[in-house]
Amino acid sequence: MLIGAHADDDALSHGTLAMLQAHGNQVYVVTLTTGNVGTQDPKLSRTQLAEIRRQEELAALKELGIPGEHYINLGYDDGLLEFEDRKAVVENLVRWIRKLRPDVLFAWDPGKNFQRWHKSDHRAAAYLAADAARAAMWRLLFEGQITQEGLREFMIPEYMFYNDYDHQDENVWVDISDFVEKRVNADAHYISQYGPGWKNYNPNPSEAEIKVMKDGALDAIRTRDGKRIEGFRYYRGLPDAIGK
């Protein structure tokens, strides 16, 4: 299960998610916002952009082999996540954690021994995911989900935290060499977010524009010991100690 703020936040883990799905795991992606603000194209409304972002994410996940019904969008406004009712958002996430009961949670890294810097929605998503993971294990937190909805408390045993600014706390590097093509093809579906679509959205970019996007996606994949990798801060244990 991955929890992110926006429809492309999972891109930092696309190779790993594709590998997990290919090996028989059931991967779910939970996006907190609709992505309905992040454009410089004056022709797009919030409603239009939200639908574009949804379709782009579904297309990207399809490239990774992840079914469309495994994509869950919680519908919050882009850019304002930290101003939402925090308790309500955590309760919403707890519900999905208790429903899906994931073996591993992928999320923005909230930080180790300090609060890691992320831009606003990413910062909020990091801590909302961590707080929801902790709350989900306690039966008397959001107990209506248990007494009225038939869910059960659940503790996520393992965590894979990602970060896009620096990698100093990484301790696990996943070899995605066999899934590079899937990651590149998936990333190329984010037309409204990368390349010329950022300022002038065109749902049918030229072959040259697609090539530029794919080249950029390939260049963004890191190399370690001659292998294409994605890096994470791996943690196993009680949610209380996620940041230690």
Question: Across the structure, where does each feature detected by a protein language model lie?
Answer:
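Metal-dependent de-N-acetylase/amidase catalytic core
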Residues: M1, H23, K87-K244
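Active-site rim/loop-helix segments in enzyme catalytic domains that contact anionic ligands
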Residues: M1-L100, A241
